[in-house]
Amino acid sequence: MSHLRPFAALSLAVVSALALAGCATATEAAVDASGAEAETISFTWDRNVAGEGEDAAYEETTVVVPKNPNNVVVFDMASLDTFGALGGEIAGAPLGSAPAYLSDYLSEDAFNSGTLFEADLIEIEAQQPELIIIGGRSSALYDDLSEIAPTIDLSIRGSFIETLERNTTFLGKVLGAEEEAAEALAELKDGIEEARAVTADAGTGLALMVSGGKLSAQAPSGGDATGRNARGGLIYDVFGVTPVVDDIEAATHGEPISFEFLVEHNPDFLWVVDRDAATGTEDAQPAATILDNAIVELTTAAKEDHIIYLNPTAWYIVFGGLETTRIMIDDVLQIAK
């Protein structure tokens, strides 16, 4: 099997061995259906069993999964990205949400496993998967899916970079592609450093989500890219953009703001995610149309042609994974052109 799918060329480096909090893996031996010994690997994480945010309750969960599994079902798009980029093939996924740029990672006869929020349990059980991967929006499906097959949750927890390293390293072990995983991570680390070098001299920025004709500002995450802080945390904390405002309220889709807010704080760059484009909202006005008005034209970002439209699928739907992180890097590097 050729493990690593092609990436855009970025400089390579060597990634050191990773030992990340909240994740533990161990290779074990098991017996498969034919009676032959089969290798397995375990994954440990703190599973959210109740509540959200400060009220969330967690339970340490360890799941043993087979190496080189067959009939893998993936609900988490970032995991679909990484699993496929490392040479794995996905048998089932929420096909209505899988982006076109990841379609090559699906088997030719891939089945629809449901949506990002709801699983087709009957169809999944009929396909007899050996591994199910969830994360983010699909995390709540764990109890039902774990009754069908070994199920692991690869949601972002804390640092975006540490999560990317943890998940890529683990999936590399599952697929026997450890070296390829390390090389891919090195490539992305170099790309992120290149992007940070560009943003270091770019003045201030504001991460902005546009949806339904309304604007919302994204908050810096303080290093925690989980949940409500995710998108702003990435542009500021990972890619080094200096926030024009520090005290934005952390919310699932950001803090609602007016067009006048943009003039008042006047960032040098606007980093825009078009949520309606990401979700395929019918008859929605594009973010570029919404921002093409007399008020926005008063901002430095508009005058200097510094309104950067980020890939909406990568930044809103997938949000992680090897190929998607490369797309994010390229989005940020637009300002160097």
Model-found features: residue ranges?
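A short, structured surface patch at a secondary-structure boundary
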Residues: 71-126
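Alpha-helical, coiled-coil/dimerization segments enriched in small aliphatic residues
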Residues: 97-100, 219-254
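Extracytoplasmic substrate-binding proteins
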Residues: 147-215, 306, 315-337
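Structured C-terminal subdomain patch of bacterial secreted/periplasmic proteins
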Residues: 268-337
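Short helix-initiation/N-cap motifs at beta->coil->alpha
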Residues: 58-59, 113-120, 249-258
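Proline-aspartate-enriched helix->loop->beta-strand connector
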Residues: 124, 128-134, 150, 262, ...
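Bacterial Sec-exported substrate-binding components of ABC uptake systems
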Residues: 2-15, 19-77, 180-209, 277-284, ...
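Ligand-binding pocket segment of bilobal, Venus flytrap-like solute-binding proteins
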Residues: 234, 250-279
